[in-house]
A protein has these predicted regions:
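Flexible glycine-rich, low-complexity coil/linker segments exposed to the extracellular/periplasmic environment
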Residues: 1-33, 133-168, 214-263
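Flexible, solvent-exposed coil segments and beta strand-coil junctions
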Residues: 20-31, 66-77, 157-169, 244-254, ...
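Flexible loop and strand-edge segments within Gram-negative outer membrane beta-barrel domains
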Residues: 24-64, 68-72, 82-162, 174-178, ...
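Extracellular loop and loop/strand-boundary signature of outer-membrane beta-barrel proteins
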Residues: 33-36, 76-81, 94, 168-173, ...
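Membrane-embedded beta-strand positions in outer-membrane beta-barrel channels/transporters
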Residues: 47, 90-92, 182-188, 269-271, ...
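Transmembrane beta-strands of outer-membrane beta-barrel proteins
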Residues: 59-61, 105-107, 198-204, 283-287, ...
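Flexible, surface-exposed loop regions and adjacent strand-edge segments
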Residues: 77-82, 122-132, 216-226, 300-307, ...
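Structural signature of Gram-negative outer-membrane beta-barrels, strongest in the C-terminal barrel
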Residues: 98-100, 257-267, 275-348
């Protein structure tokens, strides 16, 4: 409810001077969204593809480069430009070689490089701050003195200051570099010379990923106009005195240690398939062996399994299917490491 007897926080004179824009440092009116964000960003992409081959060998190569710039309205105030800047490089190379009329070897290699530069603060936090920061309590900055950026601010109570969204955005920088290499070698073998409808394939997959990260930051100095240091009768006069609001600012940039992380994934799979029709009888069978190792810490995660399927139908009307899986993981105790999982179904 409104208290009609309460003293207004802002006088009619204050509101008139703010609306007139007579002195944006004494009576600021900040559109924080316009200060922090642009109306548009750029995305650029280039792609080159090459494919060809003959009866024995087929190949495909692709190089894709993309660049995304962010909406942040930043300049190079420090040794960085911390507008969001993302570069992606992707290389794909596929080769298929027909070793014999019944044997095909394939190798697929994918390499990805990603570099991201940004403030060390999320866009979500910046949007939240522009919605919650008052536009009339302090200006974005005051005119620079001695090369120092003089961020505006004010005291909420005691020694607690407001958050200046522009300072929050400008005074930190982070860079992340990621590299991924994924290689798959696959062999397909037709075994019709043993019995018609029998095929086997195997593949080995090795994936490695690495990442490095570091950030830089500088502690900002916050100022406000000292009370009584300006002429109330000449508001267009820019002669005033600033007072420092915090003692923890710095003129020096600090940088974190470079953090590194990586992981490797190894997969091996053998697959034996059989499918054949005898008049109205359709018979199918599959036997699959798979193992996987994922390593990111000292101890790897390992999975191993054998699975199979047997199918039969008569005239595609009477159906039978049997499946089983015998799977294990090192994350369980030795006596519970493997389990058998059968399934049977009938249909008509």
């Amino acid at each position: 409810a409104r208290n009609s007897s309460a003293t207004p926080k802002y006088s009619a004179t204050d509101m008139e001077r703010t609306a007139s824009g007579v002195n944006p440092y004494l009576y600021p009116d900040v559109n924080w969204q316009d200060v922090l964000f642009k109306n548009m960003s750029m995305r650029q992409r280039a792609n080159v593809n090459i494919s060809g081959g003959g009866s024995k060998v087929k190949y495909y190569m692709s190089l894709d480069v993309s660049h995304d710039s962010g909406l942040l309205n930043t300049g190079k105030a420090y040794s960085w430009n911390n507008n969001i800047n993302i570069m992606n490089y992707t290389f794909q190379n596929n080769i298929a070689y027909k070793l014999t009329p019944t044997t095909t070897i394939k190798m697929n290699m994918n390499a990805q490089i990603r570099q991201k530069k940004s403030p060390n603060v999320s866009s979500e936090d910046l949007f939240k701050q522009i919605l919650t920061t008052t536009p009339i309590e302090f200006p974005v900055t005051y005119p620079s003195q001695d090369g120092r950026i003089m961020y505006g601010n004010n005291i909420i109570s005691g020694s607690t200051l407001y958050t200046n969204p522009y300072a929050r955005m400008m005074t930190s920088f982070a860079e992340t570099n990621e590299n991924t290499l994924n290689t798959v070698i696959k062999i397909d073998q037709d075994l019709d010379f043993i019995t018609k409808g029998l095929k086997i394939n195997a593949f080995v997959n090795f994936k490695t990923w690495s990442s490095s990260y570091f950030d830089r930051s500088i502690a900002p100095y916050y100022y406000r106009i000292k009370s009584g240091s300006y002429d109330e009768t000449d508001l267009e006069n820019t002669n005033y005195e600033l007072e420092l609001l915090n003692s923890n600012g710095s003129d020096y940039i600090s940088q974190s240690a470079i953090g590194k992380s990586s992981d490797q994934t190894f997969e091996l799979q053998f697959n034996l398939n059989y499918a054949r029709q005898f008049g109205l009888h359709n018979v199918g069978a599959m036997l699959l062996y798979k193992q996987r190792e994922y390593r990111s810490d000292v101890l790897p995660n390992r999975n191993q399994g054998l699975s199979g399927r047997l199918t039969y139908d008569y005239g595609q009307r009477y159906l039978f299917e049997f499946n089983f899986g015998y799977n294990g993981t090192e994350r369980l105790a030795k006596e519970d490491r493997f389990g058998f999982f059968p399934a049977v179904s009938l249909g008509w």
